[in-house]
Every structure is written in C-alpha cells, then in structure tokens.
Amino acid sequence: MADKRKLQGEIDRCLKKVSEGVEQFEDIWQKLHNAANANQKEKYEADLKKEIKKLQRLRDQIKTWVASNEIKDKRQLIENRKLIETQMERFKVVERETKTKAYSKEGLGLAQKVDPAQKEKEEVGQWLTNTIDTLNMQVDQFESEVESLSVQTRKKKGDKDKQDRIEGLKRHIEKHRYHVRMLETILRMLDNDSILVDAIRKIKDDVEYYVDSSQDPDFEENEFLYDDLDLEDIPQALVATSPPSHSHMEDEIFNQSSSTPTSTTSSSPIPPSPANCTTENSEDDKKRGRSTDSEVSQSPAKNGSKPVHSNQHPQSPAVPPTYPSGPPPTTSALSSTPGNNGASTPAAPTSALGPKASPAPSHNSGTPAPYAQAVAPPNASGPSNAQPRPPSAQPSGGSGGGSGGSSSNSNSGTGGGAGKQNGATSYSSVVADSPAEVTLSSSGGSSASSQALGPTSGPHNPAPSTSKESSTAAPSGAGNVASGSGNNSGGPSLLVPLPVNPPSSPTPSFSEAKAAGTLLNGPPQFSTTPEIKAPEPLSSLKSMAERAAISSGIEDPVPTLHLTDRDIILSSTSAPPTSSQPPLQLSEVNIPLSLGVCPLGPVSLTKEQLYQQAMEEAAWHHMPHPSDSERIRQYLPRNPCPTPPYHHQMPPPHSDTVEFYQRLSTETLFFIFYYLEGTKAQYLAAKALKKQSWRFHTKYMMWFQRHEEPKTITDEFEQGTYIYFDYEKWGQRKKEGFTFEYRYLEDRDLQ
C-alpha cells in the first residue's frame, strides 16, 4: 500500500514537470518565432533544445510506467506521453529550418515562397495562354476541314449539306478569332496590371464553356461575355497591332491634289509606283520625318508627251539630273509650254505644297510638317553667277525650244535646280543676288514663244544640259519642262518673294507675250510695269521667314502657311524703287532640329519615365570607376609632420642596409613591405624576408614560410603545412595541406 502511494506521488510529480516543461517549451517557441535577429534565434533554439531534452527524459520515465503492470489507469500517462511527442515534432521542424543551408539540396528543393497575389496572377495568365492556344488549335482544325470540304464541293457541285457545314465552320472560325483577340487583350491588360484578377475569374466559366461546347447543337453563347471588363475603354497601346494606314488629313490632301485640274504649266505630283517606292516605305518615312526623293513633273496639256521625272540628289550637285548648269533661280522664272498655242503663263510653284497655278490651291500629300521652310531654292548647278528673277516668275528646269531652230539668245539654261530639301534639315536659306533683266526669246518651229530670264551682261550661251529630258526636243513641238523646285515629302517649303532692283533701261513687259496666244487654263496673267520695283530690306524678309517658322509650331501639325500668287506679287511690289542696290548677303533661318526627328512634336513623358530620366541623369554625374571595385587600402599621407626636437631628426646611420633590416622584427618587415610601396625600404624589407626563408606568393599576394618539410614535392608544386602572413587580419596563420604552385613563386634574385 505504501509502495503504491509512493509510486503515485512520483507519477504526479512527473506529470507536473511535464505540464511545466510543455508550458516553458511553448513560451520559448513563441519567442523564437518573434525573434528579430539571428543571434536571438540561436539563443532561443538552444533553450528549446534544453527544454526538449528534459521532456524526453520525462517521456522515457512515463514509457516505463506505461509498460509496467502495477498501474491500472494509464490514460493520463499516455496523454502526457503524446503531448511530449507533439513538442518533439515541433522541435524537429525548427531544427530542420535552422540547419537547412540556403544552397544545399534540401534548401534548393524547398518550394519558393511566392506572393499569393503574384501566384494568382500567374495562374490566371497561364489559363489565358492555354485557352488562346486551344482556340487557335481549333481554328486550325476548322480551316483544314473547310479546305478539304471545299475541294470535295468543287468536284461534286450542288452538295448542300457540305456547303452548310462550310458556312458553319467559317462562322465558328470568325467567333473563335474574336474570342482570341479579346483574350489576348485581357492578357496584355493583366500584364500591365490594368485589370483585376477577380474580373477575369468571373468570365472564366463562360469562356471554358464556350471552348468546350461551342460546337454543340444546343450551345447558347453569352453575347455579353466581355461587357463587364470595359474592353472598349482600354488604351490604344494595348490593342494596336499595326500602324494606321493614311490619316484623315493625308486623305484630304490627296483628294484635293487629285481633284484640282492641272493647268498647262502647273506641276502635278506623281503617285508612288512600285518602281520608285512603296506606300509602306513612304508611310514610314513620313512617320520618321525623313525625306524621300521628290518626283514632280510638268504635265503637257494637249500633246500627250510623257511627264518628266525629277529626282534630285543634294549629294552630287555637280551633275544634277534635270537641271542644266546656268543661273540658279531665286524665287521664280517664267516658262511656257508650246502645247498650248504658245501661251506664256507664270509657272506654278513646284514645292511639296503642291501646284498653285490654278485658283484652288492643291496640296501634295507630303508630310504634314510643322516645319514649313521659308526658302528660295538654293543653287544646285555649281559655280555660276546667280541672277535674281522678277517676282512673278517661277523656276523651271529648262525651257526647251520647238522643232525648228531656236534663236541663239534663247536661254536653255535659265532654270537652276533646287536641291533636295531634307525634312530633317533645319536650315533654309533666303538668297538674294545681283539684278537681272527679262529677255524675250522666241522659238522657231512651233511658233511658241518661250520666255525665260537670264543675265544680259554677257553673251547668251546656252549651257549644255546633262539630263535626258532637256537634251531631246520633241518634233511635235512639245517643250520638255522639268520642275525646278524639287521639294520632297520631307516638309513643305514656303516660297518667299524676293524682289530685285531694275536695270537703268526699261525691260520688255510681259504683255508682249500675249501676242503669241491666249491662256487656256491657268491663273490670270500678270503684266509687269516697265520698271520692276526694288526689294524690301533684308530685315523685313528675314522677319517674314522667322514669322513663318514660328507660326508652324510643334502644337500645330498642319501649318496653314500658304501664300497665294496675289500675296507674292503684292509683297514684291510694295517697296519704293531705287536706282542702284548692292547685292544682298546670304541670310539663314534656323528651325529646330528636333522637328526633323519628331514632326508631330514630342510626346509628353509619363511620371515613371520622368523619374527614370532623372535617375539616369543623377547616375551620369557619378559614373562608376574601375577603382571602385578595389580593396580599400589605408591611406598614409606622405607629407612630413613636425616632430619634437628631442627625437632623431635624421635616420640612424646604416639604416638603408640589408643588415639593418634583418635585425628588425618580422612584423615590422611586413609593415614596411605592404605600406611603403615603391620605396627602397620595401625592396630591402623583401630582401630581408627572403633571407629569413619567407617566399612571396604572387596570386594571394602573401608571404609563405614552410612550417615543416613538404609532404609532396614535384617539378610544378610542393604540398605541406605552411605559415603565411595575412595582411588583412594582420597576423600569422597556419595552413595545412596547402599546395604551393611554383608558377606563383616570386623567385627573382634581389641584388
């Protein structure tokens, strides 16, 4: 009886210890999980280990009592044993977590901890991708079936069932492609975080039902499947798959240019053909603000002769394709086409703005350039003395005679060439030159009078033409006239009138040309007075050009700078006449280069882009240097510091000998070697160390000394125990089993 009471008392004490131990274990467990740093975790883990050891001893005691037959009621003992085993399992988990190295097999095998929201997003994205793939596969199957059925129906005509099946398959293909398009848009929105995952989950069941059952006869499609996602309001960047073709403005320009009747002397734009360019290339060029070669031709009205193409290349001005070398035009020259009864008319401007000879101005479909260039065409023909033209005339590429012999004073080279105005070029010149007279020349064979402007100071020698068009005169009397201002699609140019001062003698008026014939279709003729008005001052001309450049700002993609012929005449005749005027100097108008790069103006940056730009700008001021990756060395200033007079002011005698250095301690020698680089002291310290059987390792930059005889010696290395001086920790270390390769041994004989 006493034994039983004693045993029961022991059991009660043991169970009490178990409950206290479990409570203590729980407390330490909580502290371990709330620990802020690794040191605390290690401490709590050690405490946990002690506590679990105590519990394990109590468990062993409980197990012996459970196994004995003396105790009848063992339920309490078994419960406490299970409680201890539960704590042991929990400790194993902690031990596994702390002992698992980051790059061990177990550590690498553990599942990566992923943010639940990110994981959900990836799952939905994967589902969208799989659904799109499934739909595309079904589309391929439908298309192959349609193809095979089409072959069969061609052989057997009138098979209505197969025709119905083909129609049904085509409807399925169309529906599938619609869903693929929508799902791809949703996927892009998901990648850009512009749609919620929950919104996609709402349509998931309907989409899966469509994919699985779209071909069932009793299938009912949900037509409002994507309505809740507001796919109509998504940004254009998410759905645009190809660049738009022609903008509305370009279509309008094209319609205007094609609907305007072409006069006998107006230049009409040639649409791009496969021989010279493609629509896609020209579109790309427009987008980039580049200029392509302009192709403009004069259209003879009645003679059916071929239009003349003028391809201008500023890189080779010595041999321009369509311009004979002669005086270059500044603003205009008068040309006439013999096909119209020889009527002389002012030639229309042949810039990229389009023909302006007819009353309604027509526009070439060039770039909607905000950089209208106020230019007079530059000299493209080489070193010839430039002569100005009357303001009512227009440059022509070369006025040819008729089939008969031309009189010797007809200027076949009156037309100079305008070099190609590149859309990315920011400089446009306004040129003014010496005075000129209007000379009248009549062509013989076709009774057509061809008026041209040329210098009268010297003999009129016709310059040889280098182009095919101007060198061949048509026998039917068709004059080959090439356009003079070859401004291309890179940007429209604004023709600024540049008046000239008259010679002392009166010049023949343009009214004499009316005797040759009447104007059929073209603008009203202008007859000049015997005295041509003098030019405005250059400052007003420059201000005109600057106003033109300023008014075509970045904000306005379609500039409205179009001068009519009336404006040109009025502005050119407004200044009072003067008897003599020195030649005007060259002036330039500057237009920002950025307009050539982005003709539609710069796109405003987002906040994120502005932030990135600021960060890049800041980083640019602190560029990394190769020395940034080097080990930081202690800086020892070399400047002498004042010392008290009772210290030695001179180094001791014989302190620069090897014997002196050999008497120094090893640590002092190492200090001299590592911190007095490039000095004689370093050299002497190295010499002293070598005499003490230290050897320098060039790979580790450390001094090694044999601790014992090497265990292995070969021609390439020796292996054994070494003592080395660690200059970073500043102390000697022992390394066992070190392989000293002789190729890293610094073995120069220090003399």
Curated annotation (Swiss-Prot):
Record-level GO cellular component terms: CCR4-NOT complex; CCR4-NOT core complex; cytosol; nucleus; P-body
InterPro entries from the UniProt entry: CCR4-NOT_su2/3/5_C_sf, CCR4-NOT_su3/5, Not2/3/5, NOT2/3/5_C, Not_N
Location of the region described as Disordered in the Swiss-Prot/TrEMBL record: 240-534
Biased composition annotated in UniProt, kind: Pro residues: 317-330
Keyword Manganese on entry: no
Comp. bias regions, Basic and acidic residues: 284-293
Modification Phosphothreonine occurs at: 292
Segments of skewed composition (Polar residues): 294-315, 339-348, 463-472
Residues making up the signal peptide according to the UniProt record: none
Chain segments carrying region Repressor domain: 659-751
Composition-biased stretches (Low complexity): 257-268, 441-450, 473-498
Residue numbers of Phosphoserine PTMs: 299, 540
Subcellular location: Nucleus; Cytoplasm, P-body
Assembly notes: Component of the CCR4-NOT complex; distinct complexes seem to exist that differ in the participation of probably mutually exclusive catalytic subunits. In the complex interacts directly with CNOT2. Interacts with TIP120B and NANOS2. Interacts with EBF1. Interacts in an RNA-independent manner with BICC1 (via KH domains).
Family named by the database record: Belongs to the CNOT2/3/5 family.
Name this polypeptide is given: CCR4-NOT transcription complex subunit 3
Organism: Mus musculus (Mouse)
Taxonomic classification: Eukaryota, Metazoa, Chordata, Craniata, Vertebrata
